[in-house]
């Protein structure tokens, strides 16, 4: 049975009171009655609070931006990208401004597609580089996240987008990243352990791989970045020829 927001709040309140009621028994009728009375009278939570927001303004679609030569036509080779779906206006503006070599700061609401504001322009710039003949390995963009869970979420998303575009490599360098396949098993074993049906060739999964051929897109966290900057064996990632 589906409940409204108010009904859900009332259900949670009722269940929580039942939990508290069943968790404490005083063995004294007077104290038990007093406890029951206070439990029924007390306000155990605030709310629910409802927040209304207007829909975000719509912009042009990726296909329209491709037709205007703002976005590279190789975007049509990517997976899990809706080329004809209209972008939000702030997403379109981000793509256009970065394509025009301008800096941006994105401040917009939850669920408004902030990731696309930086991910699409970065992929677009790398595609343009490769079209102009720059196909050397090296880090083109670094993504810093406070938690490994967020890194993993983005890697899962990139795996869908770039699986059919092997020219752009990517990888995550965190505490969970194995040093080599001896530590993490084979690529097939890594895929199996992480519930991945097929691991794309352009996803680098070991530290050795990334030191040998730095990925175009590197995902890490603040703490690991500090270690990478001071460890001699990781310095190869940041050599000028790899940036």
Name what the model sees in each region:
Residues 215-227, 235-243:
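SF2 helicase catalytic motif II
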Residues 96-104, 116-136, 157-159:
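Walker A/P-loop NTP-binding motif
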Residues 116, 137-163, 169-182, 224-227:
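Conserved Walker A/P-loop ATP-binding site and its immediately adjacent core
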Residues 1-93, 168, 192:
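Helicase-associated low-complexity/disordered flanking segments
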Residues 180-218:
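Conserved motor-coupling elements within RecA-like helicase/translocase cores
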């Amino acid at each position: 049975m589906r409940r409204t927001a108010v009904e859900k709040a009332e259900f949670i309140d009722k269940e929580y009171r039942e939990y508290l009621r069943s968790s404490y028994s005083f063995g004294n009728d007077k104290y038990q009655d007093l406890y029951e009375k206070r439990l029924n009278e007390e306000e155990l939570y605030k709310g629910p609070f409802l927040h209304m927001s207007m829909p975000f303004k719509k912009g042009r679609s990726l296909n329209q931006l491709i037709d205007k030569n703002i976005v590279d036509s190789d975007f049509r080779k990517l997976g899990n990208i809706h080329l004809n779906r209209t972008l939000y206006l702030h997403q379109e503006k981000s793509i256009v401004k970065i394509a025009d070599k301008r800096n941006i700061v994105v401040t917009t609401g939850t669920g408004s597609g902030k990731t696309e504001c930086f991910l699409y322009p970065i992929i677009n710039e790398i595609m343009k580089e490769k079209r102009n003949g720059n196909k050397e390995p090296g880090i083109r963009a670094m993504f810093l996240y406070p938690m490994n869970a967020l890194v993993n979420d983005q890697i899962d998303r990139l795996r869908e987008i770039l699986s059919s575009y092997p020219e752009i490599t990517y990888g995550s360098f965190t505490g969970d990243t194995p040093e080599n396949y001896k530590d993490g098993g084979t690529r097939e074993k890594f895929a199996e352990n992480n519930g991945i049906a097929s691991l794309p060739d352009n996803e680098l999964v070991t530290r050795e791989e990334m030191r040998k051929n730095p990925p175009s897109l590197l995902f890490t966290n603040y703490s690991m970045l500090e270690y990478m900057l001071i460890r001699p064996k990781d310095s190869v990632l940041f050599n000028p020829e790899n940036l």
